[in-house]
Amino acid sequence: MQKAGCRLEHPSATKFRNHVMEGDWDKAENDLNELKPLVHSPHAIVVRGALEISQTLLGIIVRMKFLLLQQKYLEYLEDGKVLEALQVLRCELTPLKYNTERIHVLSGYLMCSHAEDLRAKAEWEGKGAASRSKLLDKLQTYLPPSVMLPPRRLQTLLRQAVELQRDRCLYHNTKLDNNLDSVSLLIDHVCSRRQFPCYTQQILTEHCNEVWFCKFSNDGTKLATGSKDTTVIVWQVDADTHLLKLLKTLEGHAYGVSYIAWSPDDSYLVACGPDDCSELWLWNVQTGELRTKMSQSHEDSLTSVAWNPDGKRFVTGGQRGQFYQCDLDGNLLDSWEGVRVQCLWCLSDGKTVLASDTHQRIRGYNFEDLTDRNIVQEDHPIMSFTISKNGRLALLNVATQGVHLWDLQDRVLVRKYQGVTQGFYTIHSCFGGHNEDFIASGSEDHKVYIWHKRSELPIAELTGHTRTVNCVSWNPQIPSMMASASDDGTVRIWGPAPFIDHQNIEEECSSMDS
């Protein structure tokens, strides 16, 4: 009080706390009488008249006294003092005329033959600090916080302070929990940019033409890249070194590969081509064999695909008005006429498909009851979009506008991210990092931009590519790994700075201070 200028809790409450923890029940009961004027109902009952208020307060005091005496009774029983316990039951608890059903239960504990039996039947920790602390937690609910501090209040405040610092840390990208033991309270929490995936770990050069798309598998162990050179390359991620090596090359996509989708269990890949492509390829990832090559008509344009969560169906479409639902053998299950599709996404409900179209909107299509509804409306063409894991947020790449974040539940534009150069090329952005706290996108100025989800300004601009960066994919299982695909024919793998090399990091990753 003298140093901080504020009172922690009422002196009577402090005495009450100490006497309860010491098991001095007579003194605790006297303290309770002193606290009587300060008692209130935890349910904030609105009462009328002085008599009703008095009766309500009296009832609360009785409840608190009952809890005290119950603990006293159980401790006597555990100590083998049956006569003293019986005295408490008959002469102190019963006269309160409160919760007679509980009185009957308590009386049954007299038949317990040993302490272990008592603790098991009463679901009670036994005499000591643990059970008395629980008792205090219950008693505290009847006292205002200004009279008695809520349980573990200091720990709560410290944890909130740590959480706030982490929320404000632009580069926080770890799975550390909020346990106070895992952080230092001596200094503010700050993550170094060197721990962030803004340093080139590896450059993949096996493609011999523009690389249009890249996507990590759902389990994070593989990366698929699609190129104008007509191939899909599947890369294996080393679990220890996080380096990638070529696993399989899938060939034969005559028009090139502009979009790839992993099945939910990562056993299949579906690959699409650019606007002139009427074919879709379904590959078995493990064997490298082509399971299905689907084409409904040579007039079709199949440029986007999305898997149903059941892994047995997928939807595909394009800007010439095709919108199909198919099985794994390429059989047409359903179709929607006249929808000029730019990008697709299947929601977790297993029946709703989101599709961006040439009317600068995203609509939801239900293939079961054939209903549709407008969800997002933009003023410029939506070139691509992706959905967060929880299905709440949509990340859009909008022609001439850049990257926009929408809340699908409230159907509102949340944020416009600055910095990226977006014309009419199709650029694919992504959510990423721990808890999907970050957003990354390619750009026509040859850079990869990274934002914290809550900040409009980029926190990092990654340089190294020499032409447009078409796609960025964040590893869903390794928050410190990201891949980018570019028209320069390369795929770059980004990760933290090596511990032994701290030179030239500023050239690889420039941070924008907000």
Curated annotation (Swiss-Prot):
Name of the gene: Wdr26
Organism phylogeny: Eukaryota, Metazoa, Chordata, Craniata, Vertebrata
Stored PROSITE patterns: CTLH, WD_REPEATS_2, WD_REPEATS_REGION
Statement: the UniProt record of this protein carries the keyword Cytoplasm: yes
CTLH domain span: 9-84
Repeat region (WD), residues: 206-245, 252-291, 297-337, 377-416, 419-461, 464-504
Assembly mode: Forms homooligomers. Identified in the CTLH complex that contains GID4, RANBP9 and/or RANBP10, MKLN1, MAEA, RMND5A (or alternatively its paralog RMND5B), GID8, ARMC8, WDR26 and YPEL5. Within this complex, MAEA, RMND5A (or alternatively its paralog RMND5B), GID8, WDR26, and RANBP9 and/or RANBP10 form the catalytic core, while GID4, MKLN1, ARMC8 and YPEL5 have ancillary roles. Interacts with DDB1-CUL4A/B E3 ligase complexes. Forms a complex composed of at least WDR26, a G-beta:gamma unit, and PLCB2. Interacts with AXIN1.
TM stretches of this protein: none
Keyword tags: Cytoplasm, Mitochondrion, Nucleus, Repeat, WD repeat
Protein name listed in UniProt: WD repeat-containing protein 26
GO terms under biological process: proteasome-mediated ubiquitin-dependent protein catabolic process
GO CC field: cytoplasm; GID complex; mitochondrion; nucleus; ubiquitin ligase complex
Keyword Acetylation: no
InterPro entries: CTLH_C (IPR006595), G-protein_beta_WD-40_rep (IPR020472), WD40/YVTN_repeat-like_dom_sf (IPR015943), WD40_repeat_dom_sf (IPR036322), WD40_rpt (IPR001680), WD_repeat-ST_regulator (IPR051350)
Compartments (UniProt record): Cytoplasm; Nucleus; Mitochondrion
Function: G-beta-like protein involved in cell signal transduction. Acts as a negative regulator in MAPK signaling pathway. Functions as a scaffolding protein to promote G beta:gamma-mediated PLCB2 plasma membrane translocation and subsequent activation in leukocytes. Core component of the CTLH E3 ubiquitin-protein ligase complex that selectively accepts ubiquitin from UBE2H and mediates ubiquitination and subsequent proteasomal degradation of the transcription factor HBP1.
